[in-house]
UniProtKB/Swiss-Prot annotation:
Pfam families: DUF4042 (PF13251), HEAT_EZ (PF13513). The lineage of its organism: Eukaryota, Metazoa, Chordata, Craniata, Vertebrata. The keyword Repeat applies. It comes from Danio rerio (Zebrafish). This is HEAT repeat-containing protein 6. Residues 341-352 have a biased composition (Basic residues). The keyword Repeat applies. Keywords: Repeat. It comes from the Eukaryota. HEAT repeats lie at residues 182-221, 460-498, 523-560, 566-603. SUPFAM superfamilies: ARM repeat.
Length: 1201
């Protein structure tokens, strides 16, 4: 079926005789292929009648050679072509009717009638473009075949129009033209012939390139062009871009050729990920794109290399030799420095009045291109290099840029100059759109090799400035082009955190060479400087929005903790006024930037100081001035952020944070003054800020509370009331952001109470009574209604997360009915039909089960366990993962209760429920890794919790065996390292249960074997550490089984210690000391338990070649004991419940015990015992000598001092 689309040609410009004037590029934001789904409208009566009459007339005609038919067709074609279909809505014209008209017309026009063929092709192009139609397959087949025959048989003077019609036919249909591609793109294809840069006829060449561009367009539901035609198109497009302008070709015509080639390249790149093949060199493509980014840019002339090469060092372009200016331009060059400076700042204020009430449309493009000097370099030290007329060539620095107005031109000359500038700007814009497609389809790690070609690393003082994306953002006279360069820069910066993390300039600069980290840091500083200049100089609201978005991407990815402070302060001061800008998009973007500033690597000391500064207007006066801060641009009567945070109203340094007060006022208070036409939204009566502004302000508040809670805690109750107000509004998005803010407030309080008692953070804790007041007001407000709002499951999910952020100490002081209400609602939501709500409720119960006031309540623990077990069988992997995490927390509670409450809790807890938990955890240990990692943690706790009463029941026998088998298989398996780490920890946890038959059970041999294998062979040192810790858990010799099992464990630990520094991954070395310490503790533990039957294996181990290494490592462990952090000290995993034994005490007690065995009748031979004793005595003696030497050395040092 035929369909309607938004066509490239629909906004193209053509002359009356069919000659193409040029093609306007689609905007950067709008795809050319957009299906229309508009409501039906009444058609213009004359147009509808004309289409209907012409259609009926064509259907009544039959092919013949009569002159009357030719006359009739001429009249019909003239009528159809003369109608301006783009002037009104013609959605009611069925595409099928248009297709039938074109097919019937092609049957009536023989290939011998070339004048009629020209008109038919014009009609095809106009109807399809202006009515925005993609033809169906039948029409495509008929008309493409007709055009192909016409290209083969008709005179060459017709080919330009035929190709133009063909381009409209193949638009969006490239994948359906497979049978015609050999004739079009084969070795002797017509498009290959006419699209070649050597083609002398520029009209044919332009039409062919345009046709190739439309063939490259990929439609999501259809396959892309196949090889070798895909490569043929790329080659033609690239060669077109690399070619020079023929001397006899008009500049505007050449611009339209370039624009078609760039648009085709953009379509090509949108077809899929970039693949490095021999005939597609990324460096060559980037070179031409960079060249056309500056095409016709006033004051810029550059000779670009044919290929850009990836390199960390900057690549410099060469500036051609300067030619003298003509004499008639001398008066314009003699302006004073003061007048030039005044003129350079025109973008800041002068353009405000003219462009106040309209968008940056095409008319604005022309006026902007023909306006005065808008050079963004006016604030930089390099401005004189690019704005001085004496530096650039006459061709690329036209006189319009140097004159005070366009009135010095004659009308025709001025019109052509403006038109040329507009077409050149379109080329620059198309090049940037193409580069944006490159950024999206090429892997970032490859693209970052060309970073220095597009991002500056120095301001260029004393020489030509580097030509980069910032050059366009500051220099280009058209707002759309400036915005395009900022879009590309934003795309480059997005996701660049890992690349930029290597930047560093905190240390002293090196003189011998500049490392890449310093070069990258200089590039980051130059980006801050350049974008700040663009922010100050920009007057277009749309482009200003892009500047702020680009800055937000930059701030979100820069490693400020590795750079010298001072980058954020100038930026902070300049963006504050934009929160009150007249344009809503600017206000939203400025808040987004504030959100990035307070969330990046929080808390940053520099941002902390900026947040504590008073919010008076005087603070804005320091630094670089803001041109837009004028009475015409800003709302003056009620600057709420200034009133709320002024020095008179503020509470001193400890008063409310000015940014917090600003965001609260944006959410709650009505706007006092009208905004620009771009504002939308509001409410009846006193309108609030538009919804996007309020949502972004709430987002900033959430980031501020999360990163800088100490500054927000003074307004805790006020923020709680704000969140409650948001929850009562009708807008679901506002409700959701209000709930999110509540969650961040609760989390901030919990983080304060988790801090050590002796830290500054703990000293400024919110008092518990204030926390109780806060939650009492919140839970007495609309939060409960939000939890019960089944029509808004996303809000329910967020409200569950909010409930889970209540401070345990505060929860226990809430009224009993409030506690019961929270628990009841959460238990009920675990049976919700929405998986997100169910997952959030189960997670919240997993938090509550750790509360001291709830964990000893057997009924609550049982109800929570049943809810978790039900969720553990859910279809959703996310629900099962949250349920497994909660089950791990619940079993942690069982262990705590076993140690604190004792038998009373264990006797009251249901055996059947415990059995179900064991079975469910065993089943979950075979699930996805997200579920498995917590399931094995729960298994370890459950096996630790089992008592003799449970183990004596036959019903527990098989589940116990299956649980142990699951843990052993997980340790040996190929799961993620986190899962295996938890499995090793779980086995060690199970070994702590003295009631388990560890030494005699069938599974004990397999468990020790699995741990012994892991401790010697696992690549991950943290897994090795936990397996060594598990092997050292059993408290008695009987738990290790027979002497063969004991010797296997010993040999594995000794071998692991001897090879503890061998690893394939350099990152594992950070855990090397912890691994050696844990292995030494395990070996000493086994020595303390060894019996005479174990001595042969121990003696052979310590008397061989490994003896010196083992001795040295044990001595080192004894010396450093207590200094080496234990495994898991990075906070990612739970620590062992037991305290490590003192190594020196353990060693000396073992030595004394073994000496007592000498001469005992139980010993058949003292040789093995003497070997072990000799080894231990050497360790003790060498350690004591080392300590004595260290003591003497310390005494000498003290004596000298």
């Amino acid at each position: 079926m035929a369909g309607k689309v938004t066509f490239l040609g629909s906004n193209s410009s053509f002359s009356p005789d069919g000659k193409t004037q040029g093609f306007k590029s689609a905007s950067a934001d709008t795809s050319r292929f957009v299906s229309l789904s508009k409501p039906q409208h009444e058609l213009d009566g004359s147009a509808q009648a004309q289409i209907s009459r012409c259609f009926n007339k064509l259907r009544s005609l039959s092919p013949s050679d009569s002159a009357s038919l030719k006359t009739e067709l001429n009249l019909l074609f003239d009528e159809l072509i003369s109608e301006n279909y783009s002037s009104s809505n013609h959605d009611n014209i069925p595409p099928e009717v248009v297709c039938e008209i074109l097919v019937q017309a092609s049957r009536l026009v023989p290939l011998s009638q070339e004048h009629l063929i020209i008109k038919l092709c014009q009609m095809i192009h106009q109807l399809l473009n202006q009515l925005q139609i993609i033809v169906d397959e039948h029409t495509l087949d008929v008309l493409v075949s007709y055009c192909s025959r016409a290209l083969r048989t008709c005179s060459s003077w017709t080919h330009s129009e035929v190709l133009l019609a063909l381009s409209s036919l193949v638009y969006g249909n490239g994948s359906k033209c497979q049978r015609y591609l050999p004739d079009l793109l084969g070795p002797s294809g017509v498009l290959v012939k006419y699209g070649d840069p050597k083609q002398p006829d520029i009209e044919l060449r332009r039409s062919a390139v345009h046709c190739i561009a439309n063939l490259c367009l990929s439609v999501p539901s259809q396959p892309y062009l196949e090889e070798p035609y895909k490569s043929v198109c790329y080659g033609i497009l690239l060669r077109t871009l690399q070619s020079t302008k023929p001397p006899d070709v008009d500049d505007i015509v050449f611009c339209t050729l370039l624009q078609s080639a760039l648009k085709g390249m953009q379509y090509f790149l949108n077809g899929g990920k970039w693949k490095a093949v021999p005939n597609q060199d990324l460096g060559a493509l980037l070179a031409v794109l960079k060249r056309f980014m500056f095409y016709g840019l006033p004051g810029i002339s550059v000779e670009m290399p044919q290929v850009l090469y990836p390199a960390p060092l900057p690549q410099y372009e060469t500036i051609p030799a300067v030619k003298p200016e003509p004499a008639q331009d001398t008066p314009a060059q003699k302006k004073t420095a003061a007048s030039q400076q005044k003129k350079r700042k025109s973008r800041g204020k002068g353009k405000k009045g003219a462009g106040e009430g309209k968008q940056d449309g095409e008319a604005d493009d022309v006026s902007a291109a023909g306006g005065g000097d808008q050079s963004g370099w006016s604030h930089g030290s390099q401005s004189s290099m690019l704005t001085s007329p004496s530096v650039a060539t006459p061709q690329l620095y036209p006189s319009w840029k140097k004159c005070s107005s366009d009135s010095e031109f004659s009308d025709p000359e001025g019109g052509m100059q403006s038109k040329l500038r507009l077409y050149q700007a379109r080329v620059r814009q198309s090049s940037l759109q193409c580069f944006l497609a490159v950024v999206k389809c090429v892997e970032k790690r490859i693209l970052y090799g060309y970073w220095s070609s597009f991002v500056p690393d120095a301001p260029g003082i004393g020489g030509p400035p580097p030509l980069t994306l910032l050059t366009i953002a500051l220099k280009d006279p058209l707002p759309k082009v400036r915005a395009g360069s900022l879009q590309v820069l934003s795309a480059l910066l997005e996701g660049s955190r890992q690349f930029l993390s290597t930047a560093e300039d905190t240390g002293a600069p090196r003189q011998a060479f500049t490392p890449f980290s310093a070069t990258l840091a200089a590039s980051i500083r130059e980006l801050h400087r350049g974008l700040l200049l663009a922010l100050i100089a920009e007057s277009s609201c749309q482009t200003l929005t892009q500047v702020l978005k680009c800055l937000a991407h930059l701030v979100s990815n820069v490693p400020y903790n590795r750079l010298r402070p001072g980058l954020l302060s100038p930026l902070w001061k300049q963006i504050r006024p934009y929160v009150r800008h007249r344009d809503v998009n600017v206000r939203v973007s400025s808040l987004t930037l504030f959100g990035a500033l307070v969330s990046t690597q929080a808390p940053l000391p520099e941002v902390q100081l900026l947040l504590q500064q008073p919010g008076s207007a005087s603070s804005l006066g320091s630094g670089i001035s803001t041109p837009q801060e004028s009475p015409l641009s800003w709302r003056q009567p009620a600057r709420r952020d200034e009133e709320a945070s002024s020095p008179a109203a503020a509470e001193g340094p400890e008063g409310p944070c000015w940014l917090l007060q600003l965001c609260v006022s944006l959410v709650t208070q009505p706007r006092e003054e009208p905004y620009s036409d771009s504002d939308a939204g509001g409410s009846n009566g006193a309108p609030l800020e538009p919804s996007p502004v309020r949502l972004e302000a709430l987002q900033v508040l959430a980031h501020l509370v999360k990163g800088y809670f100490s500054l927000a805690q003074a307004s805790l109750l006020e923020l709680g009331q704000l969140s409650a107000r948001c929850l009562t509004e009708q807008d679901p998005s506002v409700q959701l952001h209000g709930a999110k803010l509540l969650e961040e407030l609760g989390t901030g309080i919990i983080q304060q109470y988790r801090a050590d008692a002796n830290t500054p953070q703990s000293a400024k804790r919110v008092p518990v009574n204030q926390v109780v007041q806060f939650w009492s007001e919140v839970l007495g407000g609309p939060l409960i209604s939000a939890l019960q709002n089944e029509h808004h499951p996303t809000l329910q999910t967020s409200a569950c997360d909010t409930l889970s952020s209540i401070l345990p100490q505060a929860f226990s002081q809430l009224p009993d009915k409030t506690q019961v209400l929270c628990i009841t609602i959460l238990l009920g939501l675990t049976y919700s039909e929405n998986s997100l709500v169910k997952a959030a409720a189960v997670r919240a119960l997993g938090v509550y089960i750790l509360f001291p006031c709830l964990r000893e309540d057997v009924m609550f623990v049982a109800d929570t366990a049943n809810a978790i077990l039900t969720a553990l069988d859910d279809r959703s992997p996310n629900v099962r993962a949250k349920a497994a995490w909660s089950l791990g927390n619940l079993t942690d509670t069982l262990i705590v209760n076993m140690q604190s409450v004792g038998l009373e809790f264990q006797e009251d807890f249901s055996d059947m429920l415990l059995l179900n938990m064991l079975r469910s955890a065993t089943k979950a240990s075979a699930d996805k890794d997200r579920v498995k990692s917590n399931a094995v943690r729960a298994l370890g706790n459950l096996l630790h919790f089992l008592q003799p009463g449970h183990l004596g029941k036959p019903v527990f026998e098989q589940p116990l065996l299956e649980a142990m088998r699951a843990l052993i298989d997980t340790v040996r398996g190929d799961a993620t390292m986190k899962v295996r780490w938890n499995a090793c920890y779980a086995l060690g946890n199970a070994f702590r249960n003295q009631h388990l038959p560890l030494g005699s059970a069938v599974w004990s041999t397999e468990a020790f074997s699995a741990l012994s294998c892991v401790v010697t062979s696992c690549k991950n040192f943290k897994v090795r550490i936990k397996s060594a810790a598990a092997l050292s858990v059993p408290a008695t010799r009987e738990c290790y089984g027979d002497s063969q099992q004991f010797s296997e464990v010993w040999r594995s630990l000794a071998q692991a210690l001897e090879h503890s520094e061998e690893t394939e991954d350099f990152l594992e070395y950070r855990y090397c000391a912890s691994l050696r310490s844990q292995l030494c503790r395990a070996l000493l533990h086994l020595l303390s338990l060894c019996q005479p039957d174990d001595l042969p294996a121990l003696g052979s181990s310590v008397s061989g070649q490994s003896r010196p290494a083992l001795q040295a490592l044990l001595i080192s462990h004894l010396r450093d004991e207590g200094l080496v952090p234990s495994a898991g000290a990075d906070g990612e995993e739970a620590l062992d419940h037991s305290t490590p034994e003192d190594g020196w005490t353990l060693l000396t007690d073992t030595l004394t015990r073994l000496k007592g065995l000498l001469g005992e009748p139980v010993m058949d031979s003292n040789e093995d015992l003497e070997s072990v004793l000799s080894f231990l005595q050497d360790v003790v003696r060498n350690f004591e000598e080392m300590k004595e030497a260290e003591s003497k050395e310390s005494s000498l040092v003290l004596g000298k001092s």
